[in-house]
Amino acid sequence: MDDMSNAACCPPQGPPPLLPEHQMLQLAQQGWLSVPLPPDLAGTVAELFASSATFFDLPHHAKARSYPSKSGTEFGYYVVEKEKEYATFRCRVHTAGTAAAQSPPPTSIKSLHGLEHTAAKAWRGCALLLFRILCDLARWSHLDVSVWDDILDGTLAMPAAEEQMTYTLLRLFRYFPATGVAEPHTDLGLLTLCVGDRGGLEVLDRTRSTDEHPVWINAASQAQTATILAGQTLKALSHDTFNAGIHRVVGNPEGRHSVVFALRHSSRHDVDFGLFGGQGWRVRASELWRFIEVGKVNINTVKKRRDAQRADEELAASALAVQIQ
């Protein structure tokens, strides 16, 4: 598990197995799993926590100017009042080496470059760890590991510029003391890796929960341990063999920092469900993404918009019920 550097260059059979049978079963049934980070990746994540703390300590205008928000909440710096602030990376911005790179405030050039280099290093390490888990999943499902070739094209390293972006992202959070929360939700992608510096992340125990009485478990709260979450795309590709991991963030009196890497399918190729034992139909990457997004409330946007999204969802459900009657 320590040697991740050559995972993307392995022979056709893919990287060596990582997860034992019982952990694969847990990931399938619960939709989540705790795993120790390889030492190199743990060190990189520790560096990223330090760099992100320096970034979040900057004045608001400097953060917003350094990473302007766009694509809703899917790119750049964003604040949710009384809950959290976060920066979303989908490509390099200040270290891209192109004229299109943003001009950061002069006083923070060095720290921004350090933040971005460390984020790119963490992206690579997290992606290769999740790639190993996906290869385990393929073998466990009696599939060839090559099923991930097109789906992961361009996702295993931070893209150099916006025109090379896929849906995959790395997000740095600072949750405010006591009030920093995230409502229960599942993620959209294939697998998500979460590491926090303090407690607050909780996962749903599907085996003991009912609709009326959910049972929440404290997830790993150490910088050397990651929580792996299965997402809605993996659920769809596996034909519901893998549940999506339901999770939330509850308030911590001291606040909380976290690193979240969401590995999502590539936008460069159609997705062939036939490779995963389906009926052989192919969908465009963008169409699959829109399908996965349907009915989802964006828990990382401001409360007013979350409420509006829920209202729209309830209205659509009511209209569908009328049509069925």
What are the residue ranges of the model-derived segments?
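C-terminal flanking tails of non-heme Fe-dependent oxygenases
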Residues: 1-79, 127, 131, 135, ...
